[in-house]
Amino acid sequence: MITALLGGVGLSTGAEAAGGAGNPAVPSGGLLAAAASGPATGAGAADLNAWSAAQRVNDLKRRAHRLPVIPAAAPAAAVARPSVQAPTAAAGASVLVLYDTTGPYGYLGELYAMATANLAGHFGTVTAKPVSAYTPGMVEQYSATFYVGSTYYGGSIPDAVPAAFYQDVMTTAKPVDWIGDNVWNMANAVGIENFKKKYGWDPTNSYFSTNGSVGTINQVTYKGQTLTRKIPAGADGGVLHPALSGAGYPQVTQLALATDASTGAVTPWAIRSANLTYVGEIPFAYVSESDRVVAFEDLLFDALAPAATERHRAFVRLEDISPGSDPTELRTMADYLASQNIPYGINVIPVYTDPRGVYNNGTPQTITLAQAPDVVAALQYMLAHGAVLMNHGYTHQYGNVNNPYTGVTADDFEFFRSHVDAANNVVYDGPPAEDSTAWAQSRVTAALAGFAAAGLPRPALWTTPHYAASAADYRVFGQNYTARLERPLYFAGTLSGAPVNPGRYIGQFFPYAVKDVYGTTVLPEDIGNYEPVPVNNHPARLPADLINSARANLAVRDGVASFFYHPYYPVAPLQQTIDGIRALGYTFVGPMDLAN
């Protein structure tokens, strides 16, 4: 399972499988991560567990009418905080993303809002701001509005949602997607019967628990696909069970259904009536390539591109190619892919270095592309047979230390520090001490010089080594390349304008190209990679697993099944994967096609 990432421990989030001569691996990453432990900021599994516990307690109190809610104060100028507007994407929608900021875990709201804003960046221009900064009529300025309710208001936490937002949702004809908490406060604010008459259900009688328990909801069914929901014990805040009003009230469309493994009970996971789409949980924690987040990724089309044509494309890239690679293996891969008329990407590291001789009998070794003519010839052969050159870091390792494995190219992180803990988890320690815009640019400049010195074209695409870097680094990459193809990290402070907190972040993968909150086009990598052996507490990932993830992603009406493969593995597993994905109806395209 790919877990979520909230600072500290990388339980696979944001990292792509390692290569190198010894081929250790960091499994491919996920979307919000719950760390096994966290940094001094307090982010990690403890916070997610505490948040879910508070949610369960508040839900029981609300059911017992013991959770008084203090309404939001009238807005004042001092309440307004900076909003972040991403560049306009290919389509023309305009999107407002509102999020919570108060309570002991208020910072989660910004992380979830970034995940929502990034997905919305596939469709057009995105503006994100705290819900407390909402002003009357704002919903009318956008094609659609998304509210991510992550703070369960009540008791000692006053409602931060302005009354104007509740009223505007009720009166606007514009689509509103409400995710998670506080829809019951809207019903109380506008009148329960008024809410029922428009939407056909009663949030004030809808709860996350049944008979005192949130149950064991482990799957969501959407558009014929069974998606997983794997929440660790003690970390599940539940899925809201909407109380549908029935006869005499508007019909409610049940868009997705959740199943409780312990009872077999089925409840709506997402519903729609009138202008309101409601999703019964925030789907960004504990996700995988076949997770219920896939349903949410498709639901955005209903609000932002309802006329989108069904289209299913696939993409494969060959990973961790360096001056130390075997040119015969590269040509073998090129011949197979060319025989199948499959365009593909080649992620190339321009400098191979083994600073302590880990794989060279103790003798340090460094090889540039210019010093590896056979590899360069193989790369040119690949480019002539359907490949697109991509830049995968400068050295794909850091200094002469284990980070976290060997210090050798393709094994280790380059732009983030890490270590492996006693439980065999990869722990994300944060950016290097010398991290800065200038430092990142110096490595990019050196990498590009390495390609030029070998007579290769300048790559237009970038993939961060193991996907992990600081916010400043990601922006540098975006300034030097047409697009990034990866599963990035997004740090607290990016939306709010506060200093970026390197210990609090969310990792995310995408089923389609997006304009992210860093202002860069990010191309999808969403079904992972072939990995024949378990590593760092993650199971092997075989062709059948990749194919199953591609099948789940058929639920996204214009989605991409994007994966990567290391050329030091045999051709057969790659062939099995490609054949299986093609059999599902996917068409393989090149990386530059993914932006369209």
Q: What kind of region is each of these model predictions?
A:
Residues 32-38, 42-142, 310, 337, ...:
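Aromatic-Pro/Gly-enriched surface loop or interdomain linker
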Residues 104-185, 356:
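Helical hinge/lid and interdomain linker segments adjacent to catalytic or ligand-binding clefts
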Residues 124-130, 298-310, 328, 332-355, ...:
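C-terminal domain-boundary segment and adjacent tail
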Residues 151-231:
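A glycine-rich, often tryptophan-bearing local segment used as a flexible ligand/cofactor-contacting loop or short
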Residues 184, 343-470, 527, 560-563:
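Metal-dependent polysaccharide deacetylase catalytic core of the NodB/CE4 family, i.e.
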Residues 209-274:
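Catalytic beta-strand/loop cores that center a nucleophilic Ser/Cys/Thr
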Residues 313-322, 327, 438-441, 445-461, ...:
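Catalytic grooves of carbohydrate-active enzymes
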Residues 426-514, 569, 573:
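Catalytic domains of cell-wall/extracellular-matrix polysaccharide-remodeling enzymes
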